[in-house]
Amino acid sequence: IKNSILIRGSLEKHCLWQKESLLNLAFCNISTNKKYFAWIDHDLPFSNQNWLIESIQKLESGNDLVQLFEEVVYLDQKAIVSHRSVGRSKKMKNLNVKFQSRNAHGCPGGGWMGRVETLKNIFPVPSIVIGSGDEWLAYGFYGTKNISKPMQDQLDVYSLDVQDSLMCYPDKISNMKLNIGFTSGKCYHL
């Protein structure tokens, strides 16, 4: 993507990359003239060649955030479909969407774009060292504490301090009543 911020690392110099910390760093250093900010997992090509144009149009027409796909197709090492999931944004727009997925609420992450003015009230996102950062971010976007059973099981093994730090994030932005959309098309998780 032209003029995008690329943060390169190497195994020799860096032992750990923590996505949420990098997102916070990138957002903190965004140019003041930028209107939109996107983050995309590096292993997600999109079937919709116009995903960027469509996403910007959705933001310009009133969405605060846009998930950059409506369905994710997970591929194994031989590029054979292992399973599929609807995107979280599509699932939240239509709770009757039928799909089979490991996540009852749909895929929470993968790729998002938002208006910088809105994101100023959302960032910094929590540094989630226990994993599943996309899930916690989505809980915040939708202002819900309806934590899935697998996430609750994962959370329960940590101290109350860690639990509280994660649970306060949905509280921080839940009264924003964000207008969240999705971009048409599939992405492929390589």
Predicted ranges, named:
Residues S47-G143, Y158, Q163:
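Conserved catalytic core of nucleotide-sugar-dependent glycosyltransferases
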Residues I7-G9, Q67, G181-F182, H189:
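Structural signal for conserved beta-strand scaffold positions within catalytic alpha/beta enzyme cores
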Residues L11-K13, D43-P45, E71-Y74, L119, ...:
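Short, solvent-exposed loop/turn segments at secondary-structure junctions
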Residues I128-L190:
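C-terminal catalytic/acceptor-binding lobe
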Residues K34-P45:
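Short beta-strand-to-loop acidic/aromatic patch adjacent to the donor-nucleotide binding site
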Residues I40, P108-G110, S184:
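Residues that flank catalytic or metal-binding motifs in active/ligand-binding sites
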Residues K2-K34:
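Active-site-proximal specificity loops/subdomain of glycosyltransferases
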Residues Y36, D64-L65, I180:
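Short, Asp-centered acidic motifs that coordinate Mg2+ and/or phosphate
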